[in-house]
Regions:
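A short, basic/flexible loop-to-alpha-helix module at the beginning of a structural domain
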Residues: 1-11
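Short, flexible, mixed-charge acidic loops at enzyme active sites
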Residues: 49-56, 131-133
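Dinucleotide-binding Rossmann-like beta1-alpha1 core, especially the glycine-rich loop
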Residues: 55-129
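N-terminal Rossmann-like FAD-binding beta1-loop-alpha1 element of flavoenzymes
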Residues: 11-38
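Helical element adjacent to the flavin cofactor pocket in flavoenzyme catalytic cores
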Residues: 142-180
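Glycine-rich FAD pyrophosphate-binding loop
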Residues: 30-52
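Residue-level detector of anion-binding/catalytic polar loops
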Residues: 35-36, 116, 169
Length: 180
C-alpha cells in the first residue's frame, strides 16, 4: 500500500472505491492505455467493507438484453482467466407458471445473444441437480452449465494487480470528502 508521503496532489483520473467495480474500472482504464489513474477507498484494500466484501459472486450470463448478456459473459471469462471463477452451472427455478413462461423467454433471449448451451429443465431434472428442491412444487428451471461463482474479493485483487503493473496507484484507508 502507498503511504501519504507518496500520495499525489493531482491525478488525471480518480476512481472512488476499490471493490470489484472500482478495480474493474482501473483495470480497464489501464488496459485502454490511460495513465495517471488513482484508486481511493475509505476501507482496507481489498476487503473494503462495501458490496464486494460480502457479495455472493454469482455470475448468471443470460440477461434481458444483449449488452448485459455480453458483459456478463465477458466478466465470467475475465474472472476465469484470473483463476477467480468456479464453473458450476447456474439454475433459475420457476415456482409459478408466470415465472416458467419468463424462463422460457429467457432461454430464447440467451440463444439469440450467444448463450447456446442454456437449457430448460423439467422439475425432475432440477431436483436431480439440486436435491433440496422438491420437484412437486416447481414448474421447471433454466440451466446454463458455464454459469458459476466468482470470488469477488480475489477478482478485485487480480484486476488491481494488473492495473498496478500498468501504473495505477491504489490508496486504502483514504476517504473522499470532496471533489474539485
Amino acid at each position: 500500500m502507498n503511504t501519504w508521503s507518496t500520495f499525489p496532489e493531482r491525478a488525471g483520473t480518480v476512481v472512488v472505491g476499490a471493490g470489484c467495480v472500482g478495480c474493474s474500472a482501473a483495470y480497464h482504464l489501464a488496459e485502454s492505455g490511460r495513465e495517471d489513474v488513482v484508486v481511493l477507498d475509505r476501507g482496507p484494500l481489498f476487503e473494503t467493507g462495501g458490496s464486494t466484501s460480502h457479495a455472493p459472486g454469482l455470475v448468471f450470463q443470460t440477461a434481458g438484453n444483449k449488452l448485459m448478456t455480453e458483459m456478463a459473459s465477458y466478466t465470467r471469462d475475465l474472472y476465469d482467466g484470473f483463476g477467480d471463477f468456479r464453473t458450476c452451472g447456474g439454475i433459475e427455478v420457476a415456482y409459478t407458471e408466470d415465472r416458467w413462461d419468463f424462463l422460457k423467454r429467457k432461454r430464447e433471449w440467451g440463444q439469440s445473444y450467444g448463450i447456446d448451451e442454456g437449457q430448460l429443465l423439467t422439475p425432475e431434472e432440477v431436483e436431480s441437480r439440486v436435491p433440496q428442491i422438491n420437484a412437486d412444487v416447481i414448474y421447471g428451471g433454466y440451466y446454463v452449465p458455464s454459469d458459476g461463482k466468482a470470488d469477488a474479493v480475489s477478482a478485485a485483487e487480480s484486476m488491481a494487480e494488473e492495473a498496478r503493473e500498468a501504473g495505477v496507484e491504489f490508496y486504502g484507508h483514504t476517504e473522499v470528502t470532496d471533489i474539485d
